Amino acid sequence: MVAVAFCSLAIAGCQGSAPQPDSSPTPPSSGTARLTVLNGAYSVEVVAGPVTQSEALLATSNRGPTAYSVLATPGGAYSLRFSGPGGGAQSWTVRLNRRPGWAVVVEGGTTHLVLNLSGLQVNSLVIAGGAYAMVVDLPPARAEVPVEVTGGANRMTFVIARGSSATLVAGPGLSRVEGGSPEGSRRYVVGSGPAATGYQIRVTSGAALVVLSSS
């Protein structure tokens, strides 16, 4: 296991930078890479590419003086930690290579969380850190994809790609759901797609509002 502190190696600038590639570009042997965001920042956005080195799996950029470090394994697992003035209270963008499938885990809380994953293959998603506002844009599902949300939010928005479906199971802490068709108690469906595919979204945390839409 290799720990890489990008700021100290001058790979990612401490004063804000353009996207910089990770220095451990070994592709995952299983076909699924894993990103874990360990701690929060004021704003975190995860998007599909571009990654400047074709073999690299992720790159980051930020606004404001800050630093970050990443713990990488040869199997394509990356654990990302933000730091800097204000305890990492900065705006971060993480760009993921489009080639592998991704398992994404967000553990740290943020004020604004944007997961624009529409250009990726998403194999699973876990959001354990809370956010004031959360937007999750999901690509066409190639199989049944689990999405677990255990971190609370004032407002959660899920955008499902055309040609895919999503089923939301709402926990008792969820106050209101907009969009989607209710199916039984606290269960909602949006979109349509092939059998045995789609997103299974389970929200077990508290939320004032969840919005379901189809792009």
Regions found by a protein language model. Name each.
Residues 22-38:
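Post-signal peptide N-terminal segment of mature Sec-exported envelope proteins
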Residues 88-101:
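Extended Gly/Ser/Thr-rich low-complexity repeat segments
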Residues 105-134, 138-142:
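Right-handed parallel beta-helix
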